[in-house]
């Protein structure tokens, strides 16, 4: 919490006035990230090309620039803390479910629009896409020198190609 207080230009005591525990601070930060990503998704300028639109949407969830890297760092810290902290566990499950439902919607839309490979299992593919994005976030945050933004994008595009049987 000390480093957050320093970066915010506040005393540790002032920060603790608002957030008694580090978990409260992380939950608040995660809520802000969730709101930012939701706003960014709503403001996306869709192209009319379903494939490009899917790429644009999924790209909002991985660390491709400084803003998304910072959001990814918050997500990773929050999820790591939620594993052992029951006070924020319910919120972490809500965040997880919200992401999964988004991926399920993407994959379902691909099937409805005839973009998906013929024998695609919608629920399994949504879980696979969710796991891929989570993994790209973890590696993009913890080892950015080994998995650059360009490589993250390449992995996503390759995976979408497989889903679309291209």
Language-model segments: which ranges?
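Helix-turn-helix
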Residues: 1-24, 28
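A conserved beta-strand->loop->alpha-helix hinge within the catalytic CA
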Residues: 3, 49-53, 121
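Alpha-helical structural segments
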Residues: 7, 24-44, 52-63, 94-101, ...
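Amphipathic alpha-helical segments used for helix-helix packing
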Residues: 53, 66-90
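Short alpha-helical scaffolding segments that buttress acidic/His motifs in well-ordered protein cores
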Residues: 57-61, 75-79, 129, 133-136
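A surface-exposed regulatory interaction patch that couples sensing to output
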Residues: 64-72, 106-117
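Hydrophobic/aromatic-rich alpha-helical bundle segments in the mid-to-C-terminal region
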Residues: 87-93, 97, 111-163
């Amino acid at each position: 919490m000390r480093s957050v207080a320093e970066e915010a230009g506040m005393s540790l005591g002032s920060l603790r006035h608002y957030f008694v525990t580090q978990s409260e601070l992380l939950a608040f930060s995660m809520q802000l990230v969730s709101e930012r990503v939701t706003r960014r998704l709503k403001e996306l300028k869709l192209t009319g090309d379903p494939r490009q639109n899917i790429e644009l949407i999924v790209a909002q969830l991985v660390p491709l620039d400084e803003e998304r890297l910072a959001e990814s760092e918050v997500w990773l810290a929050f999820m790591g803390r939620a594993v052992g902290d029951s006070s924020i566990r319910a919120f972490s499950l809500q965040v997880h479910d919200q992401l999964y439902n988004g991926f399920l919607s993407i994959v379902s839309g691909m099937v409805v629009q005839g973009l998906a490979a013929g024998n695609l299992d919608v629920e399994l593919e949504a879980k696979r896409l969710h796991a891929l994005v989570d993994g790209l976030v973890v590696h993009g945050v913890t080892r950015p020198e080994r998995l650059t933004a360009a490589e993250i994008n390449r992995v996503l595009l390759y995976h979408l190609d497989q889903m679309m049987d291209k």
